[in-house]
Amino acid sequence: MSESATPHGSPGEKLRLAGLIGVLGVVYGDIGTSPLYAVQASLSYFPGNKLQESDVLGLLSLIFWALIITVTIKYVLLIMRADNEGEGGTLSLMALAQRVTQSDRTKWIIGIIGICGAGLFFGDATITPAISVLSAVEGMEVVSPGLKEFVLPIAIAVILVLFFVQRFGTARVGGAFGPIMVIWFVVIGALGLHQIFIHPNVLRALVPVYGAAFIMRHDLLAFIALGSVVLAVTGAEALYADMGHFGAKPIRVSWLFFVLPCLLLNYFGQGALVIRDPHAASNPFFFLLPHALVVPMVILATIATVIASQAVISGAYSVARQSTQLGLLPRMPIRYTNETEQGQIYVPPVNSFLFVVVVLLVLGFGSSSALASAYGIAVTGTFLSTNALAAFVYCRHFNWPLRRTVLVFGAIGLVDFAFFSSNVLKVFDGGWVPLAIGFSLITVMTTWRRGRALLHQRWQQDSLPLASFLGRLPQSRIVRVPGVAVFMTGNPEYTPSSLLHNLKHNKVLHETVVFVTVRNPGVPFVGDARRAKVEELSEGVYRVLLSFGFMESPNIPRALDLLREQGLPFNPMQISYFLGRETIVAATVPKLGFIRRAIFLFMLRNAISATEFFKIPSDRVVELGVRIAI
């Protein structure tokens, strides 16, 4: 593993202007639109007539050091080193951490941490489009308070269009995302710089003493305000999650030399404005503008928030696909919106889920300031899970001494925990929403994983070891018929139930029998050279292990074509695929509780078939039912 990850399929990480602009359009949409609401939410705890200059400087100092510690040091300098063959993200980090340990118990703990991070990500993915679009459209109220009644309808319309166009793909529109975000960052940076020239004393907030003094002076109120300060770093996870698309170096360079300076200029500009005019604290971002430019800025901000929302939605699709490949979610339909870019996907169930929840959040909360109370807790929970996984990888994979690991990641973890605990105070003020969504997803993932493990366990108990079956085969009087039969099996050491049922009912066996097991080795991509492992068990009987990465979509016929190129004596066009379809019944002593079993059965019934998921031609498939009690 290299310090700078190389994106899959890329010859290297050469810095090109087009690549840097592309990074801006995908990676920084979320964190780049945080100035719309972060300062406003942080100042909301202080009435305008009681707002002191020292309070503004203290909050700015906390925002500055949050960006330095959480984003720059933690993600840009440390966690982006821990790539999984070029890929980033919580589940990718989880898979890497599980690869570097042999302990089943440790793997289980790592899996739970990864599941928690992924579940909380979905909680965050519902809040981001809602608060981003609302905060942008609310700029109309600065033009005229009478326009307030149009904010919700316009926000709903923008969200409706955003989710509707997902099915058509974002490749064409995505080409414009980068240049638009360049304009966005330049504009917000220039607006802030203008105010800093007017009141340069605001730069004193760069000194951490002001942040520390603010905390000591206001104690509990300062602790509560941390829950809004963290809004400035929401979207930091995207820097790590999108490594596979762009590589580490372009993301680091664009952050350090463009995005971070522009964000800091805007934050400090808002602070300078509020120091001069405390009443601007009601919406400091839009009060940076001359009145005549507010409407154009509302339009630009709305476009920027749509880009931010698009990045989160695409991230949710990617996490859903990874979860499916890693066995954490049932098989779901995945549509490719670009024939040449397998990263551009559309997952209908995820899109529908996000759309419904986002609309309900907009209608339920009604304003970005109300949503700010719900925002943050899921993000900070993800920060904690990522920090724990990264600490394990640094200790085991990079061989850091335990003392150094604890010192570095312990210090960062304290910052993450401070942000998380301050957001816990907002649980009853809306923070329960992303928590409920996150823990619902965690329950779904753990239930699916547990249910599949029980199915595998019961199937194994009722199955015949493959060695025993092959030992009896030469003495049997089973009629061999022409053709090739492929039997899918979850365990290569046991005889597939579909084969036993076929023998029981049809009394024949094909001349060529291939047992196929699909595995995920915990890496994002597997090249064709490593795709298949073939073993001839006896005359005409083969065992094939196929490996697919968690960023790939398995295609069994295409993988078997590779075997023909290696000299395996069968024609894929003559293959019949035999699959088992489970019928679940309640066991005498159930191992899944009533509610979890109901959830598992619902997911099992609604999962797409193995035929569709593995891209197997439906006219070549024979399905045989199997009853399993759990």
Swiss-Prot record:
Location of the protein in the cell: Cell inner membrane
Annotated catalysed reactions: K(+)(in) + H(+)(in) = K(+)(out) + H(+)(out)
Major localisation: membrane
GO molecular function: potassium ion transmembrane transporter activity; symporter activity
Pfam families: K_trans, K_trans_C
Topology versus the membrane: Multi-pass membrane protein
Record-level GO cellular component terms: plasma membrane
Record key words, sorted: Cell inner membrane, Cell membrane, Ion transport, Membrane, Potassium, Potassium transport, Symport, Transmembrane, Transmembrane helix, Transport
Identification of the protein by name: Probable potassium transport system protein Kup
Gene: kup
